[in-house]
């Protein structure tokens, strides 16, 4: 019971340590299924970071995962439809990021979806280890994986593309300020030249 109580407490502490709400919101998908996948993967990232940096938390998180998996009946699941894809994806991210075996119920849930996930997003999953410590980089990977799994239409606009557009607009605005319309100056120069010519003729 002590370990069971420590698991959720550690999970909350790891979320506070490794999770930035603004970054999370920035890359969050719009659709329900895509968002569930995104949330599950980010939770797994935080827990995996904790397991790496503070190994003592790993066992407590394992107990939490085991309890949740058994409570939801994942140990008795017989087919993929018995387990939400988002849950299995989160388990797989944690397993691949830490190398730790999952508790039995969670292991069963992951294995039911493993073939599908690896077939659709195996190449993207290979980048997990390198992006784990950078939440924004991991969020981009998560969005790519969501697209791989067939939910790209639920992602919404790419926040990085929006930033590029804003930067381009800012640069254009800056160039216009630095290079103002010279028509007015040209007209003034012409008028001054004409005036000088009239004076010389007089």
Regions found by a protein language model. Give the residues of each.
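Short, functionally important secondary-structure microenvironments
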Residues: 1-202
